[in-house]
């Protein structure tokens, strides 16, 4: 079953050059999909169109089989959660507890049930010991984990990370990647779509989509995408170190059937 279906999508800002021109793309339910692309490639615009934050001009987008339009937009938004780039801009509550509660309060969840949900999802992202902390006492990675807890508390079918690690230090980025991996374990049917520059994150995904000039330049598993190092360089994208190493070995006649560095070294030493 498809979580997201995009057919013949065309979009431009203020009659400027088209960001997308007849784009079609399907994302399967329960998959972890990473969208890569250089600045201006259309990655974040795609996320905003899927969530209904931008209006579709031509073509069609369906979420869980429901077409995005004025009639269905609120239903669509209830099915999708989004974590944005800047952790400070999305922290609404005075404390961690208040921030996770924000969406639940808007849905008139009873207080006793709300407390249970807050504790449950704070624990899932490792923030249960910080429930009464103010945002000024949290790191960027911790704030993003709170944002994720608030999204998960609403039990969406799809979670979109829109450059959610780009403003974080290495420790914060590692924390968010660990949370995403945990989400995959806990929520098997949840679809995760991550818009990012981080090629190392893409190693963890089921599918990688490379966008360039509003078109799908490459799509496939991490293995299928990162083996195309020459094409990725033309698209101004780096590749993960492990694939640089593997591709270099391949060009020198040494084929590897793994991307585990330790296994590669062991094989080379045989």
Model-derived segments and their meaning:
Residues 36-38:
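The feature captures the beta-strand-to-loop junction immediately N-terminal to the Walker
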Residues 213-214:
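Conserved ABC ATPase "signature" C-loop
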Residues 134-138, 142:
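Conserved ABC ATPase signature
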Residues 112-129:
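Conserved ABC ATPase "signature" region
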Residues 159-162:
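Catalytic Walker B motif of ABC-type/P-loop ATPase nucleotide-binding domains
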Residues 59-67, 76:
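Conserved ABC transporter NBD signature motif
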Residues 51:
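Helix-to-loop junction immediately C-terminal to a conserved catalytic motif
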């Amino acid at each position: 079953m498809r979580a997201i279906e995009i057919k013949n999508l065309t979009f431009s800002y203020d009659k400027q050059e088209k960001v997308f021109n007849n784009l079609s793309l399907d994302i399967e339910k329960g998959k972890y999909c990473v969208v890569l692309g250089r600045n201006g490639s259309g990655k974040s615009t795609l996320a905003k169109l899927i969530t209904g934050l931008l209006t579709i001009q031509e073509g069609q987008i369906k979420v869980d089989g429901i077409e995005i339009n004025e009639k269905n937009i609120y239903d669509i938004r209830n099915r999708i959660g989004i974590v944005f780039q800047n952790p400070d801009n999305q922290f609404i509550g005075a404390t961690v507890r208040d921030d996770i509660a924000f969406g639940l309060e808007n849905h008139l969840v009873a207080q006793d049930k709300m407390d249970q949900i807050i504790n449950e999802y704070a624990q899932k992202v490792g923030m249960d010991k910080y429930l009464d902390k103010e945002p000024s006492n949290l790191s960027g990675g911790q704030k993003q984990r709170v944002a994720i807890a608030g999204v998960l508390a609403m039990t969406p079918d799809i979670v979109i990370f829109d450059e959610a690690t780009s403003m974080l230090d290495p420790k914060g980025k590692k924390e968010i990647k660990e949370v995403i991996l945990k989400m995959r374990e806990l929520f098997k049917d949840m679809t995760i779509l991550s818009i990012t520059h981080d090629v190392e994150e893409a190693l963890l995904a089921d599918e990688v989509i490379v966008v360039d000039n509003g078109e799908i330049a490459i799509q496939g598993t991490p293995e299928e995408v990162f083996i195309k190092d020459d094409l990725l360089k033309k698209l101004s994208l780096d590749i993960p170190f492990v694939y640089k190493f593997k591709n270099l070995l391949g060009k020198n006649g040494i084929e590897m059937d793994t991307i585990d560095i330790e296994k590669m070294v062991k094989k080379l030493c045989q």
